[in-house]
A protein has these predicted regions:
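Charged catalytic carboxylate motif
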Residues: 19, 23, 90, 115
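Active-site neighborhood of HAD-like aspartate-dependent phosphohydrolases
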Residues: 1-43, 100
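Short, structured helix-loop boundary elements
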Residues: 17, 38, 42, 50, ...
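A metal-dependent, Asp-based hydrolase signature
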Residues: 46-79, 97
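Substrate-recognition/cap helix-loop segment adjacent to the acidic, metal-dependent catalytic center
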Residues: 29-31, 35, 52-60, 84, ...
């Protein structure tokens, strides 16, 4: 009998694209690079925030500069990750129903662990007890 459910986070439970795009563009502006559209950022997500930044900066940017941009992004995103991020419609009710029916719920994501822990605690803390993000 199935008694546990494991979910992904971004694009599955949470719509986080706007905050990711805002922090990406803050980073690019700060570093003197052109900003990206929301659709471009959407195409860049999916393999963690380092890869997001690597894809967002201009082609040919060296690793030291990418590392600097990654640090800028992380500092900004820590302060702004929950400005626009919200669960998709019906997600909180679904998690509540599963929890109330005895299911153990977990989230495993390639989102940075600091962000996954904070967002899940704030938005799903009553129902999801295990959250694993990337280091």
């Amino acid at each position: 009998m199935i008694n546990s459910v494991i979910f992904d986070l971004d694009g599955t439970l949470l719509n986080s694209l706007d905050d990711l795009a805002d922090s990406t563009n803050y980073t690019l502006r700060t570093a003197g690079y052109p900003e990206r559209t929301r659709d471009e950022v959407r195409r860049f997500v999916g393999n963690g925030i380092y890869k997001l930044i690597e894809r967002a900066v201009p082609t040919g940017t060296d690793k030291a500069e990418i590392d600097k941009c990654f640090d800028i992004f992380c500092r900004n995103y820590k302060k702004n990750m929950a400005n626009k991020t919200k669960p998709y419609p019906g997600i909180t009710d679904m998690l509540k129903t599963l929890y109330e029916n005895g299911f153990k719920l977990a989230i495993v994501t390639n989102k940075a662990d600091f962000a996954a822990q904070e967002l899940c605690g704030e938005m799903f803390g009553d129902y999801v007890k295990t959250v694993v993000g990337s280091v």
